[in-house]
Design a protein with these regions (language model features):
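N-terminal Rossmann-like FAD-binding beta1-loop-alpha1 element of flavoenzymes
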Residues: 2-29
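Short, contiguous strand/loop micro-motifs
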Residues: 3-4, 68-72
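A secondary-structure boundary/capping signal
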Residues: 7-10, 32, 44, 78, ...
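Gly/Ser/Thr-rich helix-start
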Residues: 9-14, 38, 45-47, 91
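Conserved N-terminal glycine-rich FAD pyrophosphate-binding loop of Rossmann-like flavoproteins
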Residues: 33-64
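Glycine-rich phosphate/pyrophosphate-binding loop regions near the starts of catalytic domains
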Residues: 62-64, 73-77
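A general alpha-helix detector
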Residues: 65-69, 81
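Feature captures the FAD/FMN-dependent oxidoreductase FAD-binding
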Residues: 76-119
C-alpha cells in the first residue's frame, strides 16, 4: 500500500483524497483551516451545492468563453463521476431546479465528505 499526501482540503483536495483512498492508498489530507471545504460550505445557500447535473455542452455554454481550455479537466472527471463517487461512498444526492445537485440531507456541514474521508 502506497502513501499519498494531499495538500489542501478544498473541494478538489477532498475529491483527490477520496479517489486515492478508494484505490487502496493510505491517504493523509492536510488543510490549514479548521474546516475542510470552507468555500463549499457556503454554496447553495449553505446546503453544499456539490455540482450541476447539466450536460457538459450546456455547462460549457454557460460558464466559459474558451471551452477548449477546460475541456480535458471537465471530461477527465465530469459531474456524473463526482455524483457517482459521492453516492458510492454513502452520500445520497438529489437534483433540484437548475440542475443543481445537493446532498439529500441539505446540510452544509459537509458531513458526507467528512464521513467518506474518515473511512
Amino acid at each position: 500500500m502506497s502513501k499519498v499526501i494531499v495538500i489542501g482540503g478544498g473541494a478538489a483536495g477532498m475529491i483527490a483524497a477520496i479517489a486515492a483512498a478508494q484505490k487502496g492508498h493510505k491517504v493523509i489530507l492536510l488543510e490549514k483551516n479548521e474546516k475542510l471545504g470552507k468555500k463549499l460550505f457556503i454554496t447553495g445557500k449553505g446546503r453544499c451545492n456539490v455540482t450541476n447535473a447539466a450536460d457538459m455542452d450546456v455547462l460549457f455554454q454557460n460558464i466559459c468563453t474558451n471551452e477548449k481550455f477546460l475541456y480535458s479537466a471537465f471530461y477527465g472527471f465530469d459531474n456524473t463521476r463526482v455524483c457517482d463517487l459521492l453516492e458510492q461512498a454513502g452520500c445520497p444526492l438529489k437534483t433540484e431546479r437548475g440542475d443543481r445537485v445537493f446532498p439529500v440531507s441539505d446540510h452544509s456541514s459537509l458531513r458526507c465528505f467528512q464521513i467518506i474521508l474518515r473511512t
